[in-house]
Amino acid sequence: MSFFALPILFFLGFLILLLAFFIVKQQSAAVIERFGRFQSIRQSGLQLKIPLIDRVAGRLSLKIQQLDVIVETKTLDDVFVRLKISVQYKVVKEKVYEAFYKLDYPHEQITSYVFDVVRAEVPKMKLDDVFVKKDDIAIAVKTELNEAMMDYGYDIIKTLVTDIDPCLLYTSPSPRDL
């Protein structure tokens, strides 16, 4: 073996050893795949993987996150109203696999459910009732979201109706309303 081969082998061995270690931050999880197939979920701390065989496929935050959704809909008394719904959610630590592999875009999924529930609830109410029953709207959104998102590894912590803004333009009454 030549004099130059030994340092090169030492350097390559050191590099492969470095590739074996990785760090997972506090309140997050790392998904490990081996040749593209799920291998394990690693929690916070210094972790070890087989270099060149295992890879970190992704990381998920276990912190509470907030998504603000603005929904525009019409009330029972034909007033357009814009509601800002704040959804606080997090990935359940025991369901990281589901959160990573079953759902690609959680923000869009949550937004769709918020739109669906708000557009089902608000048209049954008059404008004044929307202000009075904003907690009922928030509870309805949370209940619906929690049922749907728990299967995907997400827990809905709280939903809040943070802003209700009636639009200045009123729709003209239909002939049957006169």
Provide a role label for each language-model segment.
Residues 33-48:
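Membrane-cytosol interface motif
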Residues 17-32:
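Aromatic-capped interface at the extracytoplasmic side
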Residues 170-178:
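Single conserved hydrophobic/aromatic residue that forms the stacking wall/gate
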Residues 32-35, 53-168:
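Amphipathic, interface-forming alpha-helical segments with heptad-repeat character
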Residues 2-21:
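Single-pass alpha-helical transmembrane signal-anchor segments
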Residues 14, 49-56:
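Alpha-helical membrane-targeting segments
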